[in-house]
């Protein structure tokens, strides 16, 4: 049975710039915002955009990500004529081969895509924080009779050299793609979100590999090939909140922005919910002696200290005399007495001993998942 559009989320990245936080988990599985993981935003956008069939392409440390996604029920992807499929490298007659790039990962999953029989494929990165209506992007793609549509957003020209830049004509037709140009001609940065006509993309990928011209990456290989061939390639301008949280600084910055009541993400918007897989925990408990100001405190938390402008994920335990400020504490962490944590990210299930100081002065301080720092005399 044919479908109109298949979503493919690229979620195999190692995320080396996140250091300790991706030692044992893929970047899209890194927690965010107190109750989410990064991939929840792409999955929720699919759910809200009526994209009913989604393939999640994984590779590096996929166990946490696989368990989190499960059968896709939190995103409504577990019903009739809908579903989510985890796509990992596998052994075939051609042998076993790791994904070598973004478009190579799609090429390796041609059999799955053919089974879904889509007219269009929506390619997404699984490691960005944003809300976006993919249906509106598809309508633009159809109206302009595009072969490829690339979602872009304007960035400050002085920062454009950090991105893949799309140079367009007056009708937003892309006439040139430049990967991190030293002297950018435009400030339209690619968001790594693409809509392709599947039959044409399939043809380009198969022809490239069969002729010894491998199409390994969308930015470096596929998009330039489309432009050179004179295909109808258009930019789709996005004007909402979008953050690539691939570094410690950007993850911390986006987490702190999450605490702003005027944040463009507007997580309380009932018309565009962000869904997630969450375990059921007891209610939070905040003692009479504690002080909590401008903070998100998750279910199952016990707070007997001071928490200012910070995020506590589920089941975080904060003992007496401890101060947490401008920090993101991931789930399951136990923090002892008289601890000072400022400008920091603490990984899941970490244990912070009594009288410990974790202060990010010139850069954000990071404690990894399950890391132990100091000793807790009252650890539970």
UniProtKB/Swiss-Prot annotation:
The record's EC number reads 2.7.7.27
**Coiled-coil annotated spans:** none
The cross-references to PROSITE patterns, in alphabetical order and at most eight, read: ADP_GLC_PYROPHOSPH_1, ADP_GLC_PYROPHOSPH_2, ADP_GLC_PYROPHOSPH_3
Keywords noted in UniProt: ATP-binding, Carbohydrate metabolism, Glycogen biosynthesis, Glycogen metabolism, Nucleotide-binding, Nucleotidyltransferase, Transferase
Q: Which GO terms describe its molecular function?
A: ATP binding; glucose-1-phosphate adenylyltransferase activity
Q: In which pathway does it act?
A: Glycan biosynthesis; glycogen biosynthesis
Do you know which InterPro entries this protein is assigned to?
A: ADP-Glc_PPase, ADP_Glu_pyroP_CS, GlgC_bac, GlmU/GlgC-like_hexapep, NTP_transferase_dom, Nucleotide-diphossugar_trans, Trimer_LpxA-like_sf
The UniProt annotation places alpha-D-glucose 1-phosphate binding at: 164, 179-180, 190
Biological process (GO) annotations held by this record are:
glycogen biosynthetic process
Instruction: List residues traversing the bilayer.
Output: none
Which superkingdom is the protein from?
Bacteria
Which reaction(s) are listed as its catalytic activity? alpha-D-glucose 1-phosphate + ATP + H(+) = ADP-alpha-D-glucose + diphosphate
Query: What does the record give as the function of this protein?
Result: Involved in the biosynthesis of ADP-glucose, a building block required for the elongation reactions to produce glycogen. Catalyzes the reaction between ATP and alpha-D-glucose 1-phosphate (G1P) to produce pyrophosphate and ADP-Glc.
Family according to the record: Belongs to the bacterial/plant glucose-1-phosphate adenylyltransferase family.
| Subunit structure of this chain's protein | Homotetramer.
Name the UniProt record assigns to this protein = Glucose-1-phosphate adenylyltransferase
Q: Which gene encodes it?
A: glgC
């Amino acid at each position: 049975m044919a479908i109109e559009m298949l979503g493919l989320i690229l979620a195999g990245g190692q995320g080396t710039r996140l250091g300790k936080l991706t030692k044992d988990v893929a970047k899209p599985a890194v927690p965010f915002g107190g109750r989410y993981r990064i991939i929840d935003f792409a999955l929720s956008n699919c759910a809200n955009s009526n994209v009913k069939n989604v393939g999640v392409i994984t590779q590096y440390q996929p166990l946490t990500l696989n368990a989190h996604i499960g059968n896709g029920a939190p995103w409504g992807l577990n019903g009739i004529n809908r579903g989510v499929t985890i796509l990992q490298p596998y052994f075939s007659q051609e042998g076993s081969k790791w994904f070598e790039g973004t478009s190579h990962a799609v090429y390796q999953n041609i059999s799955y895509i053919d089974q879904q029989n889509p007219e269009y494929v929506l390619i997404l990165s699984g490691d960005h924080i944003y809300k976006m209506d993919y249906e509106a992007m598809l309508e633009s793609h159809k109206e302009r009779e595009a072969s490829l549509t690339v979602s872009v957003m304007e960035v400050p020209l002085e920062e454009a050299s950090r991105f893949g830049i799309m140079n367009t004509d007056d009708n937003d037709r892309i006439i040139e793609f430049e990967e991190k140009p030293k002297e950018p001609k435009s400030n339209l940065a690619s968001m790594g979100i693409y809509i392709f006509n599947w039959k044409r993309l399939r043809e380009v990928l198969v022809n490239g590999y069969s002729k010894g011209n491998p199409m390994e990456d969308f930015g470096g290989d596929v998009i330039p090939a489309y432009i050179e061939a004179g295909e109808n390639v258009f930019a789709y301008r996005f004007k909402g909140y979008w953050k690539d949280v691939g570094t410690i600084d950007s993850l911390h910055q986006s987490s702190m922005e999450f605490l702003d009541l005027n944040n463009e993400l507007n997580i309380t918007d009932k018309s565009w919910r962000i869904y997630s897989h969450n375990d059921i925990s007891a209610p939070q408990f905040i003692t009479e002696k504690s002080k909590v100001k401008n903070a998100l405190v998750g279910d199952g938390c016990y707070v007997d200290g001071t928490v200012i402008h910070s995020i506590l994920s589920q089941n975080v335990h904060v003992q007496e005399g401890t101060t947490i400020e401008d920090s993101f504490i991931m789930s399951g962490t136990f923090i002892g007495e008289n601890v000072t944590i400022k400008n920091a990210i603490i990984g899941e299930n970490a244990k912070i001993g009594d009288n410990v100081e974790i202060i990010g002065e010139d850069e954000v301080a990071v404690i990894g998942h399950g890391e132990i720092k100091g000793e807790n005399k009252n650890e539970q």
